[in-house]
Every structure is written in structure tokens, then in C-alpha cells.
Amino acid sequence: MSVVSMKQLLEAGVHFGHQTRRWDPKMKPYIFTQRNDIYIIDLQKTIKMLDDAYNYVKAVAQDDGVFLFVGTKKQAQEAIAEEATRAGQYYVNQRWLGGTLTNWTTIQSRVKRLKDLKKMAEDGTFDVLPKKEVSLLTKEMDKLQKFLGGIEDMPRIPDVMFVVDPKKEKIAVHEANKLGIPVVAMVDTNTDPTPIDVIIPSNDDAIRAIRLIAGTMADAVIEGKQGADNADVEKELSESVEENSAEEVDDAE
């Protein structure tokens, strides 16, 4: 059984592509037809490729993978933050800062600055500083929070990046490609799918479509992490049983 039904995809408007004059010919294999000068995405292919994406993400999650959800367009911002957080993962939903991945060391120094400012705000340091200085520091903290808050606790560069609209997020995709980080993405009919490792043919403009696909990816992460946790528990139980059995043998001797 598929992770998402045809009915869910239709209700979310996943099948609506862009106008026929705004298309990328490389998306032709994923187009079913055109209606009123709008391309209609082949949802049979979307279902299959979404299942593939789900299984891939779940497998990486089982191996303790780190995931970065990226979607900075207005329609994606809320869903990206909520679904990444629900899965215990990380996100960029405002402007992508060039070098977020390829210049990770510098980004880490900015993240450290954000953490330091938060600590100053919490431990009372701001209370003893001049108001003007506090105002400047607060503005700096808010700006850093806006752009880096979603990756503040990311332990390392991600193992997989999930992207809404790789055409808009081309800098992020390019950085991931450069570092060999696999990209899973919602790819609309106006986008070149070539740089994407795991393609999900989909409307990438409708809020409901974005939430459905991003939510499905978050579910895959959660299921994978739970599977890993269960495997760890089973391993511990197995080792405990083996130890007890060995002790019983020793006692018998």
C-alpha cells in the first residue's frame, strides 16, 4: 500500500503543474496531459516516486541520518519549519545564506554567536548593559535567529536535504551537489530535475501540496528513527539475555 493515496494527492492539488509555456522539457516523462494550458502531473508516477523517497529517507533515518528541510518561498515556510521540527530535524525557511553547507565552519561561528547572545539575554547580561547596546545586540540576535534558528542545533552537515522548489533553491541544491549530499525534492513542471537525486514530481506552489509531501518526508524520518530505537532496544535485550545465560551456565558449573 502506498504511503499517500491518490485521493490525498488530488485533494492537495499535487497534480497541477505550471502553464505550458513555462516548462522544462526534462519533466516530460512525469507529465500526464495538459488542460487549459496547464500541465497535469502523472500522479501514478508521483505515488511510486513518493514511495521510493519515503523508503530512502526512512533507511537513512534508521542509520542515524541528519536531515535538512529547505523551503524559503512564502507558501513553504510554515510547513517546512513545523514538519522538520516534528521529525526532530533541521530547516532553512528564510533566505538561504550562501555557504550554509560549503562554508559550514563560518556558519558554525555565526551559530555560536547566536547561542552566546541568547545566553546573554537569559543570564541577565543585557540587564546591566546600556539600552542602546542592548537594542543593537537584540537586533543582531533576532536576525541570526531568523536565518539560522532552524540549524542552530544541527550537529554536522546533513546526510540528506529535502527541498521544496529546487528551481528557487538552486544555490542550496548546488551546494549539496558539490558536497555529494543527496537531494530529495518536490519538482514541478518548470524545473530541471537533473540535479535532484530523488525526484517527487509535484506542484510546489500549493500550500496543501507542500504540507502533504513535507509531512510525508517527516513521517519517514520519524518511522526510521523509531525503527533504529527499537533495534537498539532489541540488541540490548539480546545482549542481556546472552549475559544471563552465560551466568547461569557458570553457576551450574
UniProtKB/Swiss-Prot annotation:
GO terms for molecular function: structural constituent of ribosome. The keyword Phosphoprotein does not apply. Residues 239-253 have a biased composition (Acidic residues). It comes from the Bacteria. Residues 226-253 are annotated as: Disordered. Keywords: Ribonucleoprotein, Ribosomal protein. One of its GO terms (biological process) is translation. It holds the Pfam family Ribosomal_S2. One of its GO terms (cellular component) is cytosolic small ribosomal subunit. The keyword Iron does not apply. Belongs to the universal ribosomal protein uS2 family. HAMAP family: Ribosomal_uS2_B. This is Small ribosomal subunit protein uS2. It comes from Lactobacillus delbrueckii subsp. bulgaricus (strain ATCC 11842 / DSM 20081 / BCRC 10696 / JCM 1002 / NBRC 13953 / NCIMB 11778 / NCTC 12712 / WDCM 00102 / Lb 14).
